[in-house]
Amino acid sequence: MTIGDLIKNKDYDYVSYRLTLPGGDDTFAGCFASKGGEIIPLDGDIYDKDEEVISYEEWSQPEDDIQNGLTVVVKGEWIGG
């Protein structure tokens, strides 16, 4: 499943974009909204609709005006030192 698959039929006020870490955890790496299957960056970054999603969760946070929230976790590409 890709980010595009998740957003093609539902609009999200806020998508938390997270990357996996080498130890198995994940970390926040950016955010965007979606409308009509398109990504709308909220932080100026560029996101790829074709990126494979490892896991996801829908949520809401009405106190922050987020009715349709989504967290996606994608594979982090890390360069070893």
Predicted regions and their residues:
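Short, structural beta-strand-to-alpha-helix junction motif
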Residues: 1-2
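N-terminal secretory leader/proregion of peptide precursors and effectors
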Residues: 12-15
